[in-house]
Amino acid sequence: MDTRAIGFLDSGVGGLTVVCELIRQLPHEKIVYIGDSARAPYGPRPKKQIKEYTWELVNFLLTQNVKMIVFACNTATAVAWEEVKAALDIPVLGVILPGASAAIKSTTKGQVGVIGTPMTVASDIYRKKIQLLAPSVQVRSLACPKFVPIVESNEMCSSIAKKIVYDSLSPLVGKIDTLVLGCTHYPLLRPIIQNVMGPSVKLIDSGAECVRDISVLLNYFDINGNYHQKAVEHRFFTTANPEIFQEIASIWLKQKINVEHVTL
C-alpha cells in the first residue's frame, strides 16, 4: 500500500477530464494536480519552450512527493514524455498511446480522425502510433488551435464556441467513423463536437482511456492506495486565476474544490 498522491500535469484545466475519470474508477487514490493556465495553450509554442514548461510542472509535482506522474496533456506527452520518463525513477504515463489503442478498437471502417493542438498534430504521433499497431487504418489529423482558449475562458456553451467548432471540424465531417479528442481540453466541448460530427461517429477521450493504464501501473509497481479509505484529500494548483479554475473544475468534477495559486 502506498498512500502518496498521483501527480497530474496539464497546460490548464483540460487534465481535469482525466482526473474526473480517475476519481470515478479509483476513488481511494489521492491526487495532486497542477495546471499551467497562465501559459496556456502549449500547442502553438516551440518544442524547447514546451519542454522547459513541462519540466517545471514535473519538478513541482516531485516536491509534492507523488508516487506517479500522469501527463494529462497531449502536447506535453508528444514533446517531453519520453525524456521525463527516462529521467525519473517513478512511473510516468502519457495519454497518447491509450487514446490510439482505443481508436483502433473503435473504428469499423478504418477511418480515424485526430484533432489536437498544432504541436500534437505536427508531431504526427497519433498517426504513427495507430499505424504501428494497425497499418491499414487511415488517419486524418486536424489542428484545432481555437479550442483550448474557449475552454480556458469558460465559454464552452457560448454561440461563438459552437461556430468555432463547426467551422474547425467541417473538413472531417462524413469522412471518419472515429474521432480522437487528442487534447484533454476537448472533452469539455464534447456535446458540440458530437453534434457537428453526427451520432454515428465515436468520440475517443484520450485522457479517460489512460486511467485504465494508471490502474495497471499501480498494480504492477504495487503502489495502490488504501482501498478502505473513504475520504481522500486532493490538491489542485494553478498558475493563473484560481477562481476561474475552480469554476470550471466544480462543473466538470461535480464538486466544489479548493484551488491554490502557485508561481513556477
Curated annotation (Swiss-Prot):
Matches recorded under PROSITE patterns: ASP_GLU_RACEMASE_2 (PS00924)
Active site: 73, 183
Function: Provides the (R)-glutamate required for cell wall biosynthesis.
Keyword presence, Repeat: no
The species this protein was found in: Streptococcus pyogenes serotype M2 (strain MGAS10270)
InterPro entries named in the record: Asp/Glu/hydantoin_racemase, Asp/Glu_race, Asp/Glu_racemase_AS_2, Glu_race
GO terms assigned for molecular function: glutamate racemase activity
Pfam family, one: Asp_Glu_race
GO biological process: cell wall organization; peptidoglycan biosynthetic process; regulation of cell shape
EC number(s) per entry: 5.1.1.3
UniProt family annotation: Belongs to the aspartate/glutamate racemases family.
Domain of life, source organism: Bacteria
UniProt catalytic activity: L-glutamate = D-glutamate
Keywords attached to this entry: Cell shape, Cell wall biogenesis/degradation, Isomerase, Peptidoglycan synthesis
Pathway this chain belongs to: Cell wall biogenesis; peptidoglycan biosynthesis
Residues where substrate binds: 10-11, 42-43, 74-75, 184-185
Name of the featured protein: Glutamate racemase
